[in-house]
Amino acid sequence: MASILDEYEDSLSRSAVLQTGCPSVGIPHSGYVSAHLEKEVPIFTKQRVDFTPSERITSLVVSCNQLCMSLGKDTLLRIDLGKASEPNRVELGRKDDAKVHKMFLDHTGSHLLVALSSTEVLYMNRNGQKARPLARWKGQLVESVGWNKAMGNESSTGPILVGTAQGQIFEAELSASEGGLFGPAPDLYFRPLYVLNEEGGPAPVCSLEAERGPDGRGFVIATTRQRLFQFIGRAVEDTEAQGFAGLFAAYTDHPPPFREFPSNLGYSELAFYTPKLRSAPRAFAWMMGDGVLYGSLDCGRPDSLLSEERVWEYPAGVGPGANPPLAIVLTQFHFLLLLADRVEAVCTLTGQVVLRDHFLEKFGPLRHMVKDSSTGHLWAYTERAVFRYHVQREARDVWRTYLDMNRFDLAKEYCRERPDCLDTVLAREADFCFRQHRYLESARCYALTQSYFEEIALKFLEARQEEALAEFLQRKLAGLKPTERTQATLLTTWLTELYLSRLGALQGDPDALTLYRDTRECFRTFLSSPRHKEWLFASRASIHELLASHGDTEHMVYFAVIMQDYERVVAYHCQHEAYEEALAVLARHRDPQLFYKFSPILIRHIPRQLVDAWIEMGSRLDARQLIPALVNYSQGGEAQQVSQAIRYMEFCVNVLGETEQAIHNYLLSLYARGQPASLLAYLEQAGASPHRVHYDLKYALRLCAEHGHHRACVHVYKVLELYEEAVDLALQVDVDLAKQCADLPEEDEELRKKLWLKIARHVVQEEEDVQTAMACLASCPLLKIEDVLPFFPDFVTIDHFKEAICSSLKAYNHHIQELQREMEEATASAQRIRRDLQELRGRYGTVEPQDKCSTCDFPLLNRPFYLFLCGHMFHADCLLQAVRPGLPAYKQARLEELQRKLGAAPPPTKGSVKAKEAEAGAAAVGPSREQLKADLDELVAAECVYCGELMIRSIDRPFIDPQRYEEEHLSWL
């Protein structure tokens, strides 16, 4: 056998297919370019299954990807479409002439019922290999089965409904258990529930569907040839005792509601559309004599499951006459009718035929058509071939259908992922609303389209619909990108103009007060919207001009606050002399730059409140930048003006610790003009060190001199260390102050004496007060009576100076005695020194013949040597070599010079007159040999090389000279 039911094999033959749908979108007016201009794949694509049956196909059912077909009269073929290459062939093994009447497969694909023309029914489970007869069902020609989707599973069907050709509805339950010869039968029970009648009596039950609503109610729809019955009641229970019996018991005394149509095909068929497996069905289609009854299924309705019903007539050439429909299947937006030679698909929204698919005669007439709800595939078959339809993107053009029906919400739902189509729908909806005078809705839709902005705005202007135009502009503004600044500026400016014009028109109308308030609130919402803040900020200059041109000062201030343009707000309050409100804005937003700008204005009107605000700002303000405002304010010289300036400057100096010279200088000037008492206290608090004061000393001196504050000038002189000037000025004020100044130069006694002489001269010559002059002598020990006497006039008697002269003489006498004592002590000390020197000349050391040099370890007496008090002995040349490396460079140079001069000096000759003459001549020319030796000894033998400072300094000296180490290192390489 060839590969069976391969899903994606190329079909061996294709019939002529007519698929009609909505035309391609093309390039719409909005500016969108369709991305679907190329030819699209058809919605319904037919494919013949690569399968050639060995016998004629009599019946075929598909569910949950499981396909079952009957071949001939005695063969069943079961195929798992996921494993199509492994079909399961089952022989029924019947000897009579009974034919397969119908087959029924449940929603799980597990339970198969085979109804025979001999009124017998066979049952076969997916896991079983044998068809088992159902004894309780014998004698009933089964026409339909209503499977229990809520309770059925692979091992049991749960309670199900069975419709027969005699109009009876039975309840039954099947089990998949294999009981063997003596085991239980698969049909657990089979009992009658109801009989369906038409006008002539019982009628065959053509279709049965059982569903369960979300509220727990049960629904059963049963159809005959001309009627559609509904049974609504208590939900199906999971017990054999109740099942569907309770639901049908409610209709024992009265018939259920039904729909009836006059025409008769001799049969009918009901199809449901279920979006997903095990979900509730959404729509139904009933094929009967008058056409197809189509509608929605609404489980929430109390009295009927059916809603939005309408009858679609059969297409031309189809009907109860010569070419009746044989079967119907329902998809999301189409129902497909099976005819003997073709398949026709009809749109459930419009009733138009969108597909007319003819089949080749060689395959024979079509028998039936079924749908697999789990995959959405449609299956049609003839006696010699099987065909499958793929449904692809069925909803692709539904949006246009809904658009033509003016059902815009549904149209937008089905083209949400296609911007070009969505734009078309929105534009059509906007036009529709505009024609219906629903201008606000129209504006909202227009704002979402890509239609030309100018055309839409002009439409609203011509219709005098400013409110709708504002709505359109606002929504357009909200949809702009950050880079579209020009458009944003235009829209914000236009919106502001519209609001202002509307407010101006409503403001004077007392009957429109509520509307005015609402419009004002909308305008403020627009101005304060965070979404529009960026655009409004960019257009703030234009908007302020508009507000000013309309004279709307209220909103001008409101907008300035929103834009945080507090400078404009403060300026507005100042212009209207609302200075306290201006200060409140400054204090609330604490912007230093605004304080600097508006303080010169505010301080003239509310100085105390402004200074309080300055103090509240603390270190956030730079006091230097506020000085100009204070200077202009305090020029009037009034006490209140100066006191407020001083209050802030004192806060800066005492609390903030300001050290800026300009601030301290200005505070000095304020003290000098307004509070002289505080001036000296400030200067004294600042200290007397010229390097630590924060004011300009020269400026302070000039300022104090200009205002006649002499004590302050004296203090500044003292800080400048100009003590003579300080004393001169202090003598004009107070002698005691001058005395304080005179004692300041403690380290310069000459200057102190000079200053006290100034004071004494002043006291004697200006005040003529001898007692005070004598007191000056007592206050300054540097002054003597003889220093002061020249200042007294000649007529003054000596009685005034008696005590002073006596004291002076006593002091001189005491001083002379001290000098004598010191001289005696110096003489005694000199005698002791001479005695010590004599003793030193007599000191000596003993050198034994066996003593050796401390450096070379050779006998010491072989060469000239040095002997130190510590006991170390060195040859002269050995000591020279040991000392030389530790000497500084200048001493090493001096040592070489002495050695050179000693080498050039003539050796001494005893008893020679010529030698004495030579020494005398050499002495006349330069140092003698003895002097050179003495200098050399002083340089080399000043201390022991092992015990002296030289050894201590050599502790951190390396054992090997760095240069020598480098030479040794290179020699080994």
From Swiss-Prot:
<dbReference type="GO" id="GO:0005884">
    <property type="term" value="C:actin filament"/>
</dbReference>
<keyword id="KW-0479">Metal-binding</keyword>
<dbReference type="GO" id="GO:0006886">
    <property type="term" value="P:intracellular protein transport"/>
</dbReference>
<feature type="repeat" description="CHCR">
    <location>
        <begin position="618"/>
        <end position="772"/>
    </location>
</feature>
<keyword id="KW-0967">Endosome</keyword>
<comment type="function">
    <text>Plays a role in vesicle-mediated protein trafficking to lysosomal compartments including the endocytic membrane transport and autophagic pathways. Believed to act as a core component of the putative HOPS and CORVET endosomal tethering complexes which are proposed to be involved in the Rab5-to-Rab7 endosome conversion probably implicating MON1A/B, and via binding SNAREs and SNARE complexes to mediate tethering and docking events during SNARE-mediated membrane fusion.</text>
</comment>
<feature type="coiled-coil region">
    <location>
        <begin position="454"/>
        <end position="481"/>
    </location>
</feature>
<keyword id="KW-0072">Autophagy</keyword>
<keyword id="KW-0458">Lysosome</keyword>
<dbReference type="GO" id="GO:0008333">
    <property type="term" value="P:endosome to lysosome transport"/>
</dbReference>
<keyword id="KW-0863">Zinc-finger</keyword>
<dbReference type="GO" id="GO:0098978">
    <property type="term" value="C:glutamatergic synapse"/>
</dbReference>
<dbReference type="GO" id="GO:0016567">
    <property type="term" value="P:protein ubiquitination"/>
</dbReference>
<keyword id="KW-0862">Zinc</keyword>
<feature type="modified residue" description="Phosphoserine">
    <location>
        <position position="3"/>
    </location>
</feature>
<dbReference type="GO" id="GO:0005776">
    <property type="term" value="C:autophagosome"/>
</dbReference>
<comment type="similarity">
    <text>Belongs to the VPS18 family.</text>
</comment>
<keyword id="KW-0968">Cytoplasmic vesicle</keyword>
<dbReference type="GO" id="GO:0007032">
    <property type="term" value="P:endosome organization"/>
</dbReference>
<feature type="zinc finger region" description="RING-type">
    <location>
        <begin position="853"/>
        <end position="947"/>
    </location>
</feature>
<keyword id="KW-0813">Transport</keyword>
<dbReference type="GO" id="GO:0006914">
    <property type="term" value="P:autophagy"/>
</dbReference>
<dbReference type="Pfam" id="PF05131">
    <property type="entry name" value="Pep3_Vps18"/>
</dbReference>
<feature type="modified residue" description="Phosphoserine">
    <location>
        <position position="13"/>
    </location>
</feature>
<dbReference type="GO" id="GO:0098793">
    <property type="term" value="C:presynapse"/>
</dbReference>
<keyword id="KW-0472">Membrane</keyword>
<feature type="modified residue" description="Phosphoserine">
    <location>
        <position position="11"/>
    </location>
</feature>
<feature type="modified residue" description="N-acetylalanine">
    <location>
        <position position="2"/>
    </location>
</feature>
<keyword id="KW-0653">Protein transport</keyword>
<feature type="coiled-coil region">
    <location>
        <begin position="802"/>
        <end position="848"/>
    </location>
</feature>
<protein>
    <recommendedName>
        <fullName>Vacuolar protein sorting-associated protein 18 homolog</fullName>
    </recommendedName>
</protein>
<dbReference type="GO" id="GO:0019905">
    <property type="term" value="F:syntaxin binding"/>
</dbReference>
<keyword id="KW-0007">Acetylation</keyword>
<dbReference type="GO" id="GO:0061630">
    <property type="term" value="F:ubiquitin protein ligase activity"/>
</dbReference>
<feature type="modified residue" description="Phosphoserine">
    <location>
        <position position="912"/>
    </location>
</feature>
<dbReference type="GO" id="GO:0008270">
    <property type="term" value="F:zinc ion binding"/>
</dbReference>
<dbReference type="GO" id="GO:2000300">
    <property type="term" value="P:regulation of synaptic vesicle exocytosis"/>
</dbReference>
<dbReference type="GO" id="GO:0046718">
    <property type="term" value="P:symbiont entry into host cell"/>
</dbReference>
<dbReference type="InterPro" id="IPR007810">
    <property type="entry name" value="Pep3_Vps18"/>
</dbReference>
<dbReference type="GO" id="GO:0005769">
    <property type="term" value="C:early endosome"/>
</dbReference>
<dbReference type="GO" id="GO:0033147">
    <property type="term" value="P:negative regulation of intracellular estrogen receptor signaling pathway"/>
</dbReference>
<dbReference type="GO" id="GO:0030136">
    <property type="term" value="C:clathrin-coated vesicle"/>
</dbReference>
